[in-house]
């Protein structure tokens, strides 16, 4: 049975799982007497757990200004919905995933103002301005993002940008695995 819009909330003894299904949240007007949510108790003989990963933010002043988003959210807008999150997007990252976001934006025809990578000596993977060994120190704008301030060895400068995608890397989602006394193991090959 496929259960869309359902989140497993816990793992319990005997192969029992708690799951919350959002039934009518996505509808402007649901069927009469339909519940908003159903909490399911699922008992399974066997389970495949694919918990995925959660993107980490990068903290800096005013990182909660409208127009500042996680890089994975920007890629969802671009790749799933063909929607540009801005006209001049900057990417602040410490890993290769931020560069992937810039390439996806370029493929949709969205302007990439800059990729700001905290790592030294990184090479651009596409046709976009790259500031390696740099960081975002401030965001500017009254009703939303209008520019960002970055700092590198060359000093500080301000770049016009109406969207800032942030990627601080990925953490494996091990919550449910740990409910079952599973322990994460590092594997260099994956």
Write out the residue ranges for each language-model feature.
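Residues forming the flavin
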Residues: 1-190
């Amino acid at each position: 049975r496929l259960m869309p819009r359902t989140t497993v909330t816990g793992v319990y003894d005997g192969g029992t799982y708690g799951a919350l299904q959002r039934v009518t949240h996505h509808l402007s007007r649901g069927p009469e007497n339909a519940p908003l949510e159903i909490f399911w108790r699922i008992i399974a003989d066997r389970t495949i757990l694919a918990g995925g990963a959660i993107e980490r933010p990068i903290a800096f002043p005013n990182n909660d200004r409208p127009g500042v988003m996680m890089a994975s959210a920007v890629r969802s807008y671009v790749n799933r919905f063909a929607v540009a999150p801005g006209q001049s997007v900057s990417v602040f990252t410490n890993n290769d995933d931020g560069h992937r976001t810039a390439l996806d934006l370029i493929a949709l025809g969205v302007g990439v103002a800059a990729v700001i990578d905290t790592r030294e000596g990184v090479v651009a993977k596409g046709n976009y301005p790259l500031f390696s060994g740099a960081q975002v120190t401030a965001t500017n704008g009254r009703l939303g993002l209008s520019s960002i301030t970055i700092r590198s060895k060359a000093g500080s400068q301000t770049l016009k940008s109406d969207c800032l995608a942030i990627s601080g890397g990925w953490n494996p989602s091990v919550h449910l695995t740990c409910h079952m006394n599973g322990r994460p193991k590092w594997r260099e090959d994956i």
